[in-house]
Amino acid sequence: MPKRRQKKYFTSLPDDPQPIVHEVRHRLAFSEVDALAIGWHGHYPEFFEMAHTELMRKIGLTYDLYRENGIGAPIVQLHADYFAPLILDEFFTIRAELVWSDGARINVNYEIIKENGQLAGTGYTVQMLFDAYNHTPFVTTPPLVESVWQRWKNGEFKDL
């Protein structure tokens, strides 16, 4: 059987700021496995969210700040590919990579990496930014997010 393609979903253009990366280590819990003690595929979005939340917290975009600024950021696309099983009690790393976008959206690539370095899964999410009060999409990036994007362009997140 041919090897499935293991790729990045979003890529940067030459003039874009470098992606911002954050990793979270996690041990697969009993509540996260199926009857065969293998990580249940339905938990992968939760794993993605663990790394995503910490990455966004590090750059100053928390869910509390979204609410305070009237911003909604629902996931409108979620994709996952599975390459190797995670086993009960196994440690693994979830890697989130925020990739630059000029639009009012947030693009994040994910990798789930086993302790031995083997890639267990990859995925991505797309979040669209909208006005939380009238539920309409933002045509331009809202000021809170734009201020963080400006800091990103200025290179403030290189050492995260």
Residue ranges with predicted function:
Residues 107-108, 125-126:
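Short loop/turn microsegments at loop-to-beta-strand junctions
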Residues 2-77, 131-160:
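Hot-dog-fold acyl-thioester-processing enzymes
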Residues 111-114:
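Core beta-strand residues in small-molecule sensory/regulatory alpha/beta domains
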Residues 116-118:
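A glycine-centered beta-loop-beta connector
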Residues 123-125, 141:
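Short hydrophobic alpha-helix segments
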Residues 27, 81, 126-128:
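Residues in well-ordered beta-strands of folded domains
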Residues 55-106, 120:
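Hydrophobic beta-strand-centered segment that forms part of the acyl-chain substrate-binding groove
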Residues 22, 121-123:
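Extracellular and select intracellular beta-sandwich modules with Ser/Thr-enriched
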